[in-house]
Amino acid sequence: MSLPISKKNNAKSIYNKNIYLNFAKYILNCQDSDGGIRWEPSSKLDPWDHIESAMGIDVLGFESESKKAYEWLESNQETDGSWYSLYHCPETNFLKETNFSSYIAVGMWHHYLNFKDKKFLRRFWPSLDLAIKFTLSGQTKYGDISWAKDQE
C-alpha cells in the first residue's frame, strides 16, 4: 500500500507516511464490504463518523474505497433524505439527525477537491439534494433547524 502524500525522500517524510498509512489501514479495516465504515471493526456506524472516515481516506488517496463509502450512504438513505443516527447496534434507533444528513455535502466537496471527479458529484447529487431537503424540513417558524427527528 503506498500513499501519494510526499515525494521527498527524507526521514521525516517517511515517518509521516508510516503514520498516515497506519491511519488508512485502520479506517480500511473498519470498512465493511458494502462500504460502511464503522467506529471500530464489528462495531456501530453513524453517518457523521462514516463521512469523516471517508474524507480521511480521500486525503490518503484511497479514491475507490471512499466512493464505496458514498455508495453505502446512497443505498442506506431513507426516502425522506435522512439516515438513522446509528447502524449495527443492538438497540432500536429511529432518530434521524439533521446535521448528519446535510454533512454529506461536506464529504462530497472534500472528495471532489481531492480527485476533481465531476462524475462523482453528478452520481451522488440526488442523495445530497434529498439530504439537504430533509435538513431544511426541520426548520422551525423561527428559522432554526431542529437537531433531530424521531419517526415514532
Name each model-derived stretch:
Residues 46-50, 57-141:
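Aromatic-rich carbohydrate-recognition surfaces in CAZymes
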